[in-house]
Regions:
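Conserved, single-site charged/polar hotspot
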Residues: 2-391
Length: 391
């Protein structure tokens, strides 16, 4: 998630479905030919856990970060988490690990654990590349590439705690900690950043919430993000890494993404996490609840009215978009000419009966029933909490 409006982390939407309520009476709209459909909605994201706009609204009302988190994750306890985390760097789509030369750069052979200082030989770049023989080699570039050493295992670059600049097809970016080659169970070579948990957070928090927001809100975000990372560390995505760097997990931008105010929030909450049953909680969060959070897969992610989300600075508390009926007909061609939209299930919370669980589109060729999440995704809507007006 980046900047305002704060985006939600897509993988944070993973949760078990709740038992939906029946649709509200009158949740049926007849669609004439060439109709314009106004879709009015509340919120942005899945609605589970902390609303980021709600956290800022609560901070503006004087709530501390601990009280903000207590509201959005009721029943959790406080604990600590430290150590390292390993992060997939998705921007590096190559098989090689390529970095800019810098003072103090070393390489470690992961098979034997030996760490070797790289010489000051005029190199501009260093890389670990695998040959056709399956052997990893360390190479350096002056005017051309030169071989330096062969490795028994994979390679890992480290600069004594100073940032290392990774070169990728998407551009250069600096990272704290170690950059290594990882190999997944499928045999894919990936680039992995291994670093201290709180240093990782410094590259997450300003991309998940504006660092300029109230300190209490940013601190709440730091704890929620730390807890989520600690949870993922216990449930790693791969044998090669524990968490990814996109909105499928938490957006992570490395050292280049850091900002002083968000670093302060990480430092002020150092090591603090929320626990459930003695383990890091599954602290989902999203941009805006729209005024009601949605029930998640665990008791500390309840559906509840959110009085903090609707402050004047939240542009996605209530929103609307207009689409022609042809958009829906092209998205679901099995319907033919669209004649009716009928919401069949909602979650029962808030305006219009709450978030849509399922709806049916009927037309001249047939009808299609889709989930609220599918409807939202295919139309690019901000949430499933919507209603319609036809003109």
């Amino acid at each position: 998630m980046r900047a305002v409006p704060v985006l939600f982390s897509a993988a944070l939407a993973a949760s078990l479905p709740v038992i939906p309520a029946s649709a509200a009476t009158g949740d049926v709209w007849r669609i004439p030919t060439d109709a314009t459909i106004t879709i009015r909605g509340h919120g942005y994201g899945h609605g589970h856990g902390m609303s980021q706009y709600g956290a800022e609204g609560a901070a503006r009302e004087g709530l501390s970060y601990r009280k903000i988190l207590g509201f959005y994750y009721p029943g959790t306890d406080w604990g600590t988490a430290r150590g390292r985390v390993t992060v997939l760097i998705t921007a590096d789509t190559t098989d090689d690990l390529l970095v800019e030369a810098r003072t103090g750069l070393t390489v470690r052979d992961t098979a034997g654990g030996a760490r070797m200082a790289l010489p000051d030989n005029g190199a501009r770049r260093w890389k670990v590349a695998v040959g056709n023989d399956g052997v990893n080699r360390v190479l350096y570039r002056t005017r051309r590439w030169h071989r330096w050493k062969a490795l028994d295992g994979q390679g890992e670059f480290y600069a004594g705690g100073d940032p290392i600049t990774l070169v990728t097809p998407a551009g250069d970016r600096a990272y704290r900690g170690r950059l290594r080659v990882g190999v997944t169970s499928a045999g894919d070579r990936v680039t992995v950043n291994a670093l201290a948990l709180d240093n990782y957070l410094k590259g997450v928090v300003p991309l998940e919430m504006p660092a300029s927001w109230s300190p209490a809100a940013v601190r709440a975000q730091a704890v929620a993000a730390r807890t989520y990372a600690a949870y993922e560390r216990r449930h790693p995505q791969s044998s090669a890494y524990q968490i990814c760097d996109t909105s499928s997990c938490q957006v992570y931008g490395g050292y280049d993404a850091e900002y002083p105010a968000s670093n302060d929030a990480v430092d002020a909450t150092a090591g603090r996490v929320l626990l459930a049953g003695g383990e890091p909680a599954f602290t989902q969060f999203g941009s805006s609840s729209g005024g009601w959070t949605a029930a998640g897969s665990v008791p500390y992610l309840p559906a509840q009215e959110d009085p903090y989300d609707g402050w004047a600075g939240n542009p996605v508390h209530t929103w609307s978009v207009k689409v022609g009926d042809g958009v829906l007909e092209r998205t679901w061609p099995a319907v033919g000419d669209l004649r009716r939209i009928a919401v069949t299930k909602r979650d029962g919370n808030g305006d219009w009966g709450g978030r849509i669980s399922s709806l049916t589109l009927s037309g001249t060729k047939g009808k299609v029933t889709v989930t609220g999440d599918t409807f939202r995704t295919l139309l690019g809507l901000r949430s499933t909490w919507v209603t319609f007006r036809v003109s």
